[in-house]
Amino acid sequence: MSHTKKPTIEKIILALLGLLALAALVRTMFLGLEIDEEYALSLGFRLVRGDRLFYSMWEPHQLAALPPALLIGLFTAVTGTTTGVLLFVRGAVLAVKLALAVWFYRSLRVALGGRCAYLLALAVLAFTPKWFLGPDYVSQQFHFTLAAFLFLYGYYAPGPRQYRGLWRVAAGGVCACLSFLAYPQTLAAAPVLMLALLLLGRGSADKCRGLWVFVLTCAVCGGAFVVYVLQGMGFDFAALLARADLILHDPQYDFTTADRLAMLRSKLSAVIGNCWLSALAGVALAAAGMLFGERRGFARSLEKALWYTAFFLSLWCTAYCLRAQELDFRYMCPAFALAGGWTFWCDRREAGHRPLRRLLFWLGWLPGIAAYLFILRSTLIALPTTFMYLFWPAVCGTAALLLKPRPTRRHRAAAALLAAGLLLACAVPRLCLVLETGWHCEPITAIQPERITRGPAAGTWADTKAADMQDACMKPSPPMRARACSRPSVSSTASAF
């Protein structure tokens, strides 16, 4: 093949992958309804209509109501109605995702190379934790975490603007606080981030300014939030503590560490059963490399086996989703995160690209792992479902492959294949499958989409069953009680609009 044809084919493939990611998101924007998305919007709408956090709202996820409330408030102020607000919110989230993906690409293009930065940016663009675009607490946590990383990376990254523009650190602190607010369990990442800023600024008083600005910003944001909540309760601090205690002791989260470990152990065999074939193939390829003359040592051979396993799992997850019609299948995320962590460890003493590796490790990978471990302890969801929280460490781990001391063409090609595998696992199932009511998926070719013309979901399409349910919800019904302690049903969620 001539040298002129090779770049042309590569550009065509990259363009097709970009179209795949966009097509998956556009499909998600216009087709499908999901109860968690409606629930997230109903929390925001309750703030718009006058309910107050911890006073007339009792849901455990109420802290994630502020961003949806801003979007819904803007929409209702302009239009005077909630008809079509779901499509507006989805469009706003899609615009934010596009901006973050472009920002990610521009920030890391020099460090990672244009091709791999582009593929990882597409993976970040295509990924939504719960398969819908609405800003629920998990989606907010991921996207605010990404924004915080990009702000902090812009301040600490080597280059002419390093340690300039403290506003970046302040903005990163605001985004980190919004991430913690949306999903309080991820607060475990805060001490890791503070330690990271301390280590990255070590050796100079000027460099340490970033840490103090970050801490001060977090303190101001925390204080402002407490004042906002208190003013809705008549500044009764004792009442706020009592309400918070009641919400934090929700019966559905009343389990011990031993109970949680038992739950996780019960799912471990299923995880191993779905991963062993890919792991065996990865080990076999790494062993074959050693047999045919590669003298890499145990640590490097294990690194190679882990990355082979991660790549095979990304392909397996994509194929399994289409075969079993299952959207919640992300075993590749812990594989990528684990392989990336091992790469960081193997390269810890290498001088080449060390500053960039430190940034990815301390600002991206390690805070993500810390947050995941605390989520793993504090949530009731099944072990495989928690893997969605490892997507960000998986992205950081893949980027670490390109920050080798002496990256070769093989390293760049391997990183590109891994990033493409991550992208396919995120985009293909969402493009080809549609989530139906009852957590069940159907191929997009098998459903009969029906356009919704009334209510908050107007302008979107859904399968006939979900559309009929949405239409039934728009019939007159009693308003949702402000003090409902349990999670609303589909009917009460829709009637809240």
Locate the predicted segments by residue.
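Membrane-interface alpha helices of multi-pass inner-membrane proteins
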Residues: 129, 165-184, 190-195, 219-220, ...
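Membrane-lumen/periplasm interface segments of specific transmembrane helices
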Residues: 211-290, 315-319
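Perimembrane helix-loop-helix junctions
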Residues: 157, 189-226, 291-296
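Short acidic/glycine- and proline-prone juxtamembrane loop motifs at membrane-interface regions
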Residues: 133-142
